[in-house]
């Protein structure tokens, strides 16, 4: 019987949970603010982890840039805390990446909503 998840997938889920807790409770850098870990991708040998994050202030480019700099500066500390929290032989090297999928999804949703409204207006005007 085949496994449902690869080990790297299970480790990625656990890393996502642990880093979310670490960012919320341990990291005190004011540049980071309200950050959400949206996804984690771990290499098959578990030596590298890409951590995709979003910020509460997604509309402010400067704040996002500062938040990413804060995360990069705190990454060695976060990695050490991750090593203490998880029982892994090798703690993956972590890299933070800003996840634009949420922003893009909202933009696409707004575009679709606007097109539907315009289409409804046309149909109302044509029926009058």
UniProtKB/Swiss-Prot annotation:
Name this protein carries in UniProt: Ribosome-binding factor A
Organism the protein comes from: Haemophilus influenzae (strain ATCC 51907 / DSM 11121 / KW20 / Rd)
Localization in the cell: Cytoplasm
Function: One of several proteins that assist in the late maturation steps of the functional core of the 30S ribosomal subunit. Associates with free 30S ribosomal subunits (but not with 30S subunits that are part of 70S ribosomes or polysomes). Required for efficient processing of 16S rRNA. May interact with the 5'-terminal helix region of 16S rRNA.
Classification lineage: Bacteria, Pseudomonadati, Pseudomonadota, Gammaproteobacteria, Pasteurellales
Oligomeric and partner information: Monomer. Binds 30S ribosomal subunits, but not 50S ribosomal subunits or 70S ribosomes.
InterPro entries: KH_dom-like_a/b (IPR015946), RbfA (IPR000238), RbfA_dom_sf (IPR023799), Ribosome-bd_factorA_CS (IPR020053)
Main location: cytoplasm
Entry GO CC: cytosol
GO biological process: maturation of SSU-rRNA; ribosome biogenesis
PROSITE patterns for this protein: RBFA
Record keywords, A-Z: Cytoplasm, Ribosome biogenesis
Annotated family: Belongs to the RbfA family.
């Amino acid at each position: 019987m085949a496994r449902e998840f690869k080990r790297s997938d299970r480790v990625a889920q656990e890393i996502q949970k642990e880093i979310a807790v670490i960012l919320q409770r341990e990291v005190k850098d004011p540049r980071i603010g309200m950050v959400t870990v949206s996804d984690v991708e771990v290499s098959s040998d578990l030596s590298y982890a890409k951590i995709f994050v979003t910020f509460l202030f997604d509309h402010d480019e400067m704040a996002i840039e500062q938040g990413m700099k804060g995360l990069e500066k705190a990454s060695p500390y976060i990695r050490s805390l991750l090593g203490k929290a998880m029982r892994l032989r090798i703690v993956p090297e972590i890299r933070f990446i800003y996840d634009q999928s949420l922003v893009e999804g909202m933009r696409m949703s707004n575009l679709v909503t606007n097109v539907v409204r315009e289409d409804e207006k046309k149909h109302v005007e044509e029926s009058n």
